[in-house]
From Swiss-Prot:
NDH shuttles electrons from NAD(P)H:plastoquinone, via FMN and iron-sulfur (Fe-S) centers, to quinones in the photosynthetic chain and possibly in a chloroplast respiratory chain. The immediate electron acceptor for the enzyme in this species is believed to be plastoquinone. Couples the redox reaction to proton translocation, and thus conserves the redox energy in a proton gradient. It comes from Nuphar advena. Keywords: Chloroplast, Membrane, NAD, NADP, Plastid, Plastoquinone, Quinone, Thylakoid, Translocase, Transport. NDH is composed of at least 16 different subunits, 5 of which are encoded in the nucleus. This is NAD(P)H-quinone oxidoreductase subunit J, chloroplastic. The lineage of its organism: Eukaryota, Viridiplantae, Streptophyta, Embryophyta, Tracheophyta. Its EC number is 7.1.1.-.
Length: 158
């Protein structure tokens, strides 16, 4: 079954893949990394002016990484928002996605957290650096293949 967002993208010949609907009835779409920035701009112009959240996860050990965006469009009032979930999958060997910071400023800390925890680099982000872990930290702690160090320095406890 195709939702409103998917139908709109098909109408405008924008490449995507529908992943169905979640338990709340929100449509989930898969977008290729190279198409993401264009579709993000078009989504903003279409009315998705609120980035509710951005997160990322490791799909499987040695597999793909995913960056997830929850967009909201409020057209007919606050009590009737239209929502869509966008997933962008990237290989862990080259985890690069265009940043949407310049479209939705709320992506700032969220993209940085995804970088810090999973190593997904968001191209053209103005401050792409660690936000939770020390700059000297080696590796990406939320990757399923991450090997945790078996020692911690006293300075890391502060």
């Amino acid at each position: 079954m195709q939702g409103r967002s998917s139908a709109w993208l098909v109408k405008h010949e924008l490449v995507h893949r529908s992943l169905g609907f979640d338990y709340q009835g929100i449509e989930t779409l898969q977008i290729k990394p190279e198409d993401w920035y264009s579709i993000a701009v078009i989504s903003y112009v279409y009315g998705y002016n609120y980035l509710r959240s951005q997160c990322a996860y490791d799909v499987a050990p040695g597999g793909l990484l995913a960056s997830v965006y929850h967009l909201t469009r409020i057209q007919y009032g606050v009590d009737q928002p239209e929502e869509v979930c966008i997933k962008v999958f990237v290989p862990r060997s080259n985890p690069r996605i265009p940043s949407v910071f310049w479209i939705w400023k709320s992506a700032d800390f969220q993209e940085r957290e995804s970088y810090d925890m999973l190593g997904i680099s968001y191209d053209n982000h103005p401050r792409m650096k660690r936000i939770l872990m020390p700059e000297s930290w080696v590796g990406w702690p939320l990757r399923k293949d991450y090997i945790a160090p078996n020692f911690y320095e006293l300075q890391d406890a502060h």
